[in-house]
Design a protein with these regions (language model features):
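Metal-dependent polysaccharide deacetylase catalytic core of the NodB/CE4 family, i.e.
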Residues: 6-18, 74, 79-80, 87-94, ...
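Short, well-ordered helical secondary-structure segments
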Residues: 29, 34, 83-85, 223
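Aromatic-acidic/polar surface patches that form glycan- and anion
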Residues: 40-43, 135
């Protein structure tokens, strides 16, 4: 049988901001984002109703490692093997992931959560910036909302499974601006990764660069969030460092450079990751 994979982006909390042509303007390039948000985003209310509907229809969240895992052969090689999943009759497994949990700068002020933080109980929760600039903390995005749902519907999760958090790295992770490449004035390895189009990329860096004086503290905060997510049952995946559509454009050299940069800037914050979720499919 097939096991569906359902994925989401960061959830829209305040529709009055996200879908307002006068508010949802990217501060980076001046582009109106309403059409994009309407096309690829889900609201908090929609997400909650989707979870309820899937639960009613008998779907059960499973880990991707419940579906298949590595088995070591006699010669030392490893192969992927399907794993048995034991669910009650009438139940159907599915895998869930959430892309781009970086809370990109262009989304600032548009009615989305602003970052993931570690809550008072040690589990991941959301920081949300209200329209008046004040901060609230709670279930404003996929991770804490799904956690809440599983807590009240434990039979929705197989063996404590949660979802996969797919992360890029070019603006950091979880809402923390952790990329030395973009945010550290002392970064000295730009040309090591972008030699394939160095002149144009140097020009782009000059327009994109925004220093973060708190970058080292942000890295530590991101590590704490990563550990809290892992302890809570969440998995991590690479979404490529630069959100590159793999195999459709660019060279192998470009993909290799991107992968090495992800390993350099994101892996130290997350730990080992062996899943990749391709941007744009």
């Amino acid at each position: 049988s097939t096991i569906p994979h359902i994925f989401f982006h960061t959830l829209v909390v305040d529709t009055s901001r996200a879908f307002d042509d006068n508010i949802a303007i990217s501060k980076q390039d001046g582009m109106n984002k309403v059409k994009d948000y309407n096309y690829v985003m889900t609201t908090v209310d929609e997400f909650c109703r989707i979870l309820e509907e899937m639960y009613t229809r008998g779907y059960v969240l499973v880990s991707i490692y419940d579906v298949a895992s590595y088995e070591t052969q006699a010669d030392g090689t490893q192969v992927m093997k399907h794993q048995p999943i034991y669910l009650p009759e009438g139940k159907k497994p599915f895998v869930l992931s959430v892309d781009d949990v970086s809370y990109y700068e262009y989304m600032t002020g548009h009615g989305f959560a602003s970052k993931l933080v570690v809550g008072e109980d040690g589990t991941p929760t959301s920081e949300y910036t209200n329209s008046d600039g004040s901060l609230s903390y709670g279930s404003y995005d996929v991770v804490p909302i799904l956690d809440d749902f599983v807590e009240t519907h434990p039979d929705f999760s197989y063996r404590g499974a949660k979802g996969i958090i797919a992360l890029t790295g070019y603006e950091g992770i979880f809402g923390y601006r952790t990329s030395d490449f973009w945010y550290n004035s002392n970064c000295d390895y730009f040309d090591q990764y972008f030699s394939w189009n160095l002149e144009n990329n140097l020009k782009k860096k000059q327009t994109m660069y925004q220093p973060n004086p708190n970058i080292e503290q942000d890295k530590e905060s991101a590590k704490q969030v990563a550990q809290a997510c892992r302890d809570d049952g969440w998995l991590f995946a690479s979404h490529t460092w630069g959100h590159n559509k793999v195999g459709d454009s660019g060279s192998y050299e470009r993909f290799e450079s991107d992968s090495r940069l992800w390993d350099r800037e994101v892996k130290p914050l997350l730990g080992d990751v062996d899943i990749i979720i391709y941007p744009q499919g």
